Amino acid sequence: MMNHKRKLVWLIVFALLLSVTSIETGFAKPKKKKEALTGTPVLWERPNDIASRDLYLGPGGAAMRPDLRRITFIKEEKGGYSKKYRVKDGAGREWVVKIGKEAQSETSAVRLLYGLGYLTEVNYLVPRVTIPGKGTFSNVRFEARPDNLKRAGEWKWKQNPFVGTPELQGLKILMALINNWDLKDSNNVILKDGNELHYAISDLGATFGHASTTPLFWRFTRSRNSPANYAKSNFFEKVKGDRVVLHFGGKNRGLMKDISIQDAQWIGSLLSQLSDRQIRDAFRAANYTPGQINLLTGEVRERTNELLSLRPAVQIGRN
């Protein structure tokens, strides 16, 4: 009996020694180290051509439009609110197509951000397309997956190289202006382009709708891609000293607590350089109806004017 126990103990010791030795000698599979990101972070590039930017074709221009002569299904993309597929077009380029309610709103949102100098994804709205084996769909967003860009993870709203800068403050205000209530870090992406790290918002689908500022009703009242709801929603609430209180009912509401009048006027001055025709083109590119284009364009212009008209609140009496 004792001999049996001793043999068992020695077998256990031998097994442990073998496992330690295998780790030290490299037999065990080493953990893959996370590659450190190197490059110059870029969120926004100062544009000198806002008034002439093409908001119909957007950041990809005519050159990057998908070749629809032949579409090949690759796989289904998991995650998110909308159904998504990875496909290859007739030129052999890969795309992630988004089907459903978010396709139109995201297409327009990307174009407005691009028009002001923000780094964005490249996308196009295709009114009707057949994906072999999956079906025929209307209003499909094609988002490019170019070979020269490496998707290098997400970035955080509260921890990034641009905290406190006008461009990040302006981006926050833009999110409230287009009613993007889904401000999750997981909706952001870093795109490595050569020696630059492009900080972009990868999911702008939950825009041009409405979300209540009352926490209890937030999940029941929120909408996306609803021009009528967007036009009826509020944007600006009040000025407290030199701070701006925006009507924002989305996730990460704390992001909107440090907006100054100077921040608002900075982004407002950029928006004011867009013509009504350019703003209309951003919505026309997403295949909205003429009536919806008028409604959305008018609301964006009205909100721009609100930003430009803000002045510090006058305090009367003692503090």
Describe the residue ranges of each PLM region.
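Regulatory N- and C-terminal appendages and interdomain linkers associated
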Residues: 5-73, 92, 276-319
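Conserved, well-structured beta-alpha core segment at the onset of a catalytic domain
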Residues: 6, 19-24, 91-94, 100-101, ...
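Conserved ATP-binding subdomain of kinase catalytic cores across diverse folds
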Residues: 59-158
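Extracytoplasmic/secreted envelope proteins and their assembly/folding machinery
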Residues: 84, 106, 110, 171-174, ...
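Solvent-exposed, acidic/flexible segments
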Residues: 99-106, 163-170, 177, 181, ...
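Conserved kinase catalytic-core segment
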Residues: 111, 153-223
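Short polybasic/polar patches that bind polyanions
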Residues: 114, 179, 284
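C-terminal catalytic region of ATP-dependent kinase domains
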Residues: 197-319
